[in-house]
Curated annotation (Swiss-Prot):
This is DNA-directed RNA polymerase subunit alpha. Homodimer. The RNAP catalytic core consists of 2 alpha, 1 beta, 1 beta' and 1 omega subunit. When a sigma factor is associated with the core the holoenzyme is formed, which can initiate transcription. NCBIfam families: PRK05182.1-2 (NF003513), PRK05182.2-5 (NF003519), rpoA (TIGR02027). One of its GO terms (biological process) is DNA-templated transcription. GO terms for molecular function: DNA binding; DNA-directed RNA polymerase activity; protein dimerization activity. SUPFAM superfamilies: C-terminal domain of RNA polymerase alpha subunit, Insert subdomain of RNA polymerase alpha subunit, RBP11-like subunits of RNA polymerase. It catalyses: RNA(n) + a ribonucleoside 5'-triphosphate = RNA(n+1) + diphosphate. The N-terminal domain is essential for RNAP assembly and basal transcription, whereas the C-terminal domain is involved in interaction with transcriptional regulators and with upstream promoter elements.
Amino acid sequence: MQSSGLLKPRIIDVQSVSPVQAKVVMEPFERGYGHTLGNALRRILLSSMVGYAPTEVGIDGVLHEYSTVDGVQEDVVDILLNLKGVVFKLHNRDVVNLKLVKEGEGAVRAGDIELPHDVEIINPEHVIAHLSPGGKLAMEIKVEKGRGYVPGNVRNLGDAKTIGKLVLDASFSPIRRVAYAVESARVEQRTDLDKLIVDIETNGVVEPEEAIRYAARVLMEQLSVFADLEGTAPVAEASKPAQVDPVLLRPVDDLELTVRSANCLKAENIYYIGDLIQRTENELLKTPNLGRKSLNEIKEVLAARGLTLGMKLENWPPAGLEKA
């Protein structure tokens, strides 16, 4: 198949505004492509990013959300709203049950929640409630992994729902805000081109640049089916080497895995990220000394880069790739 001949962006500028906000500028695009791609990326970022949110809460002495708690200034509705503002990040797990017990006058903050070693709170200073003298607040919080927005009344909670548990609407998305703008760009004598500017802010669970990379990969995966409509492999124009994503050419050491996990992979001749993503979970679990904990670690670091296990790569390994 012949090349489309359309311009591809050659200038990509990432402007970090803060650790959770960035502006990404890409140019040049053919006229109209700025809006086409900008809108697609924005919708994917808002709807398809994986995040974590509290989904169920139990508060001592509370049977329904319209109650009050003695010694707590806020009512239960306000407590639940404040709890939704806590930003959780789970490592190596999809669900966790946490406890919070606080007594005495003062503010109850997110940092007062008891955490296991593989759970992190991004905003520990976030205020959940205020206690009066002699007040006490004790609660259990269920945090789950998900994507998008899921109302509490549509989740399948089964028949084992405990009386007194309050079900929350869950907003899993780690994207607080994303907007795009299209400006004019120029290449030599052409002035009818687009410049795409994506302004993104996250809650800290994922970096802005990684979020855009992930959204781009989702878009590519969804569109790939249209490229295969003919069902036959296109005839190569010439013996040009296949283009390989530079990320796949990076050694697995760049994933910053534990020494144990890294050594297990190298023992199986897995030296590059491209080698790793083609292995399935079952294949990795058969690796000596690599258990479920190491597998979860590998899956998490790959997911942060928009990659998964069991992916299929054509023309791998590329010519000239050296094995360490």
